[in-house]
Amino acid sequence: MQEISIGKTYKHYKGNIYKIIAIAKHSESDEEMIVYQNIEKGDIWTRPKSMWNEVVKGGVLRFTLID
């Protein structure tokens, strides 16, 4: 499993580049969430930490650490 760290940059399997800006907790479930920003567009997203290192279609990681 790869490192998940604030400030690190990752490539999504569909090609976009994102930077992790925070690790948060869901207000109802306490589930850890990754808060990340699209480097090019500036959009901010959140995704459960449990999904970050998932293997998706074609057997590739959802996100790959690039920096």
Where would I find each of the regions flagged by the language model?
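Short coil-to-beta transition motif at edge beta-strands of beta-rich domains
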Residues: 2-13
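Short beta-strand-centered aromatic/proline hotspots
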Residues: 16-25
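Intrinsically disordered, low-complexity, charged/polar segments
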Residues: 43-67
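Basic/aromatic-rich interaction segments and small domains that mediate binding to polyanionic partners
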Residues: 24-49
